[in-house]
Structure formats: structure tokens, C-alpha cells
Amino acid sequence: MKIHQVHKLVVHNVVNFAEKCLYSPSNQNVMYKPFVYGTSVSGENFTDRVNETTRIKKNFSSGINTILISPRRLGKTSLVKKVISELDGKDPVIVFMDIYDCRSAHDFYLRYSQAILKALSSTAERLMENAKEFLGRLAPRISITPDLTSEYSLSIGVTPKDIDPEEMLNLPERIAEKKGLHIVVCIDEFQQIGEFSDSLTFQKRLRGVWQHQQRTSYCLFGSKKHMMEIIFHS
């Protein structure tokens, strides 16, 4: 996928974080794990990856597209979230989305637009305003409800026949141009697009739109190394 300048970073298992169980000093009958394993981590549980963190931060700040490829459980998601936590979130604006459960291009477009609008909106009112301003032509049915974390979730009711793929894929670029921003869209489990029906057509559409964007860059990462390599070398 040739979209502007692309840096591909293969994440290796630099430090062996094999899961260990030791006796707790306070209670020898209780086992504990010194390392969090099998889920994304942050704070004191995130160790090493200094060079990778620095490089990705520079990519994000410079508008360079980044591809992370490695097997599962080597810390790709934690690495990206670590970088996001160290940036101020204002310039560039970071959008994070996971498409593991997306089963079609339509699912992707909805997840993509929801994540972008939510990242660019500090309140429910602003979320509604941005949705109407930038997706109003599609006449979507928009509902905003508080979720369990006291934040707001956005539901965009648009049928596949109503979607203009190029308009949806250009959403971050249109917002960035209007508001004078730079945006980085991070997409986890990106290899999932290889499972979509007519995946090659969808991939060509992504390339065709994204390669012309000047204020939006992408960080694409996934755990199925073989599928990721097929996508980016096809």
C-alpha cells in the first residue's frame, strides 16, 4: 500500500515476557504474575520498546504512515497506545479503532466514521454537530447514548446503498482541512479487511482515496502476519 511515505516496523519479541508465577512474599500460598500477559498494558506494566516508541512518535508527528506487522501477543496494541498516551492529543489528533469484529466494508465504514467523529468531539453536543456537518448529506439516523464509562457512543444508521465510500474514507481529511488539524488514524487488526467479500476491490478503494490525503496519516497493524503481508504487497 503506497500512501505517501510508509515506514514498516516489524515488532520482534525484544524481551522475553514469558508468563511466570511466583509465590507472593506476603502469602506463600498465593500465586501472582509479575507480568501482565495476553492483553494490552500501560503504565508500569509497559516495559522496553524505547526505540520503537520514539520512532512511531516521530512518524505520527511528521505525518508518516506506519505499518506494524507481528504475530499476536508481542505488544503492538500496547505500543501504539503507549505512543498515544505520550502525545498531547491536540496535534496530531489521534483516532484509535479496532476492526476485529468488522465483517464487511459497510461495517468498516461505520466503525471508521464513528471513531473519527468521536475522537474529534469533546462533548455529546459537539459530536452531534460534527456528525451533521460532515455526514449530513448522507442523512444518517444518528443516536448518541452514554455508555458504561460515562462517555458517549455514536450510532450512525446508514444502509449500504446510501454510503458513498469515497466520502466516508475522506472524512478525516475533510475534517482536518476544515479545522486546520493533522490527524493520525490507528487501525488495529487491519488484516481483517482480507476477510471481506471482494477484498481486493476494497483495498484498491482504500489506496485510491488515502494516497491523496495530505493532513491524514495512518498507523495500520495486525496480528496475522501472513495476511498483513499479502495486503501490503498485493
Identify the residue ranges that each predicted region occupies.
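Conserved phosphate-binding and hydrolysis motifs of nucleotide-dependent enzymes
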Residues: 49, 75-76, 188
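Conserved nucleotide-binding/hydrolysis micro-motifs of P-loop NTPases
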Residues: 63, 100-105, 192, 223-227
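Sensor-1/coupling segment of RecA-like P-loop NTPase cores
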Residues: 177-179, 183-186, 192-198, 205-234
